[in-house]
């Protein structure tokens, strides 16, 4: 067989294979910026920002809260399906319903929606863009305001072992009330430290109970668990006769 052409040898690390003044190749899938000047755009990443730069506003963001873009996408899909209504009222209605039933992936909303369909249909569209809890987190301040103003605690606050003093914190997106990425509305009243502690405690208990379902214990009492949580059985060394 004849000699086959050999592929070009890659340049050694640290070398400069391009002639001075030439344009480096564009990587696949990248779009060159015609306005870029590599020599002048390097900048100093270690410089101290000016007072004006520090004063520039930056919107709060949280991966636990639905973004405005996601919410606009939800409304667009609802309208495309023929579910037309006041979007603020319709989505708030779903969030306040979840105030009672929870916003977990297993939540099954019931009843009609202001969009002219069922709440379950609205929830299905929501879940194409974000989790139900992320949407509820966004509307949590408004949910809190209505609940406190109407003296209307979540329906299952007693079953969740909340006290009368902390009952208004007995919903699973309570964190959204004070999250800066949530809807910006003045609060009817601030959550009390007791309500904040009760919500955090309940979350820890719920997390432990979920993990303990894989245990072989018949009780979650700390007398048995010593506060430890294990989702898989411990690895044991073989016995002397093994």
From Swiss-Prot:
Keywords: Capsid protein, Helical capsid protein, Ribonucleoprotein, Virion. Residues 219-232 have a biased composition (Polar residues). GO terms for molecular function: structural molecule activity. Residues 1-16 have a biased composition (Pro residues). InterPro entries: Pltvir_coat (IPR000052). The keyword Ribonucleoprotein applies. It is found in: Virion. Residues 1-41, 219-242 are annotated as: Disordered. PROSITE patterns: POTEX_CARLAVIRUS_COAT. GO terms for cellular component: helical viral capsid; ribonucleoprotein complex. Pfam families: Flexi_CP. Required for genome encapsidation. Forms ribonucleoprotein complexes along with TGB1 helicase and viral RNA. Belongs to the potexvirus capsid protein family. This is Coat protein. It comes from Strawberry mild yellow edge-associated virus (SMYEaV).
């Amino acid at each position: 067989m004849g000699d086959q052409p050999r592929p070009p040898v890659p340049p050694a690390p640290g070398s400069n294979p391009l002639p001075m003044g030439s344009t480096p190749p564009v990587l696949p899938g990248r779009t060159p910026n015609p306005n870029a000047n590599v020599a002048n755009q390097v900048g100093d990443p270690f410089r101290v920002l000016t007072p004006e730069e520090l004063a520039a506003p930056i919107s709060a963001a949280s991966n636990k809260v639905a973004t405005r873009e996601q919410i606009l996408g939800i409304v667009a899909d609802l309208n495309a399906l023929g579910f037309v209504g006041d979007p603020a009222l319709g989505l708030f209605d779903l969030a306040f319903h979840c105030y009672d039933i929870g916003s977990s992936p297993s939540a099954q909303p019931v009843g009609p929606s202001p969009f002219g369909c069922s709440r379950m249909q609205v929830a299905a569209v929501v879940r194409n863009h974000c989790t139900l809890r992320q949407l509820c987190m966004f509307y949590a301040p408004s949910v809190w305001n209505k609940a406190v103003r109407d003296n209307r605690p979540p329906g299952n606050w007693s079953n969740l072992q909340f006290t009368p003093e902390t009952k208004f914190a007995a919903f699973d997106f309570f964190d959204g009330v004070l999250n800066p990425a949530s809807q910006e509305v003045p609060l009817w009243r601030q959550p009390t430290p007791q309500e904040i502690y009760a919500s955090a405690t309940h979350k820890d208990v719920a997390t432990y109970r979920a993990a303990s379902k894989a245990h072989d214990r018949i009780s979650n009492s700390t007398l048995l668990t010593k506060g430890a949580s294990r989702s898989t059985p411990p690895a044991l060394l073989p016995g002397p006769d093994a």
